[in-house]
Curated annotation (Swiss-Prot):
A biological process from GO: 'de novo' UMP biosynthetic process
Keyword match Nucleotidyltransferase: no
EC id: 2.1.3.2
Family: Belongs to the aspartate/ornithine carbamoyltransferase superfamily. ATCase family.
Subunit structure: Heterooligomer of catalytic and regulatory chains.
Record's catalysed reaction(s): carbamoyl phosphate + L-aspartate = N-carbamoyl-L-aspartate + phosphate + H(+)
Protein name per the record: Aspartate carbamoyltransferase catalytic subunit
Function per UniProt: Catalyzes the condensation of carbamoyl phosphate and aspartate to form carbamoyl aspartate and inorganic phosphate, the committed step in the de novo pyrimidine nucleotide biosynthesis pathway.
Chain residues that bind L-aspartate: K79, R160, R221
UniProt entry tagged with the keyword Ubl conjugation: no
Length: 298
């Protein structure tokens, strides 16, 4: 595969191969000089900590070099240069590009003009395929993906991680339960598509209605940066919170995931519970992204 733009570009076999490669890497079965002499460009036009740094760490662990542009203002786009021209220029310097951009569809556009592979690190409310791969890898570490009941809680309208994850889950025998504040439900078109693909999607009003049925609880923050105004954001902020009390009586093996950053949707007391896997999930970004880089560059 030349590019990683959307999880829709993957079939189940491709996902399983990447997860297997990430597992080998996690067990130190890789060449630390495989990317020697290779250069990765990270173009991040939205804030990022985990995605940007884990790609940098992944490239470094494979022996390569990263060049990072971390703001619109620091690029010639601030002078009026188009994204397409920026990509054309940068692709002449490097062996692959990782792009994060606020506009949905920007990564696909970049892949069409780039002379090197492009990895989508998030395009607005669109897709985030590398996050989905590490989410699946984290689930697989605890249980088979087939047969799980997974609950998605939070901003499912603007949250690109859930958009990517739900489509990937449609490739497995998973039941998807959704709980969202008013107006932040999973887009109806996506729900319809998932059901057309044969995936059971069950919508709930409250997390309490379903939490004891879940094998995985995937929590997301309210995407403040996607809201048209501050008032709209504060109308739904702090409308849900995962606490130790809420998790009492859930399945013994149930895990809590979160793509991070969190705001106040998970009580810090949960961090020490055996259910909490979100920091492990974040750490899994390095081996998963190493596997991706090996595929697109090596």
């Amino acid at each position: 595969m030349k590019d990683f733009i959307s999880i829709r570009d993957f079939d189940r076999a491709a996902i399983d191969r990447l997860i297997a490669e990430a597992e080998r890497i996690d067990h130190h079965q890789y060449d630390p000089l495989e990317m020697k002499g290779k250069i990765l460009a990270l173009l991040f036009f939205e804030p990022s900590t985990r995605t940007r740094m884990s790609f940098e760490a992944a490239m470094a662990r494979l022996g390569g070099t990263s060049l990072t542009l971390s703001s619109f203002e620091a690029s010639s786009m601030a002078k009026g240069e188009t994204l397409a021209d920026t990509i054309r220029v940068v692709s002449g310097y490097v062996d692959a590009i990782v792009l994060r951009h606020p506009r949905e569809g920007a990564a696909r556009l970049a892949s069409e003009v780039s002379s090197v592979p492009v990895i989508n690190a998030g395009d607005g409310a669109g897709q985030h395929p590398s996050q989905t791969l590490l989410d699946l890898y984290t689930i697989r570490q605890s249980m088979p993906i087939d047969g799980i009941n997974i609950g998605l809680l939070g901003d499912l309208r603007y949250g690109r991680t859930t958009h990517s994850l739900t489509y990937a889950l449609s490739l497995y025998d998973a039941v998807i339960h959704t709980v969202a504040p008013a107006g932040l439900n999973l887009p109806s078109g996506l729900v319809h598509e998932l059901r057309e693909l044969g995936t059971e999607v069950i919508e709930h009003e409250q997390i309490e209605d379903v939490i004891k049925e879940l094998d995985v609880l995937y929590v997301t923050r309210i995407q403040r940066e996607r809201f048209p105004d501050t008032a709209s954001y504060f109308n739904v902020a702090s409308s849900y919170r995962i606490t130790p009390e809420l998790l009492r009586g859930t399945k013994e093996h149930m895990v809590v995931l979160h793509p991070l950053p969190r705001v106040d949707e998970i009580d810090p007391r949960v961090d020490k519970m055996k259910n909490a896997r979100y920091f492990e999930q974040s750490h899994n970004g390095v081996p998963v992204r190493m596997a991706m880089l090996k595929q697109v560059i090596a």
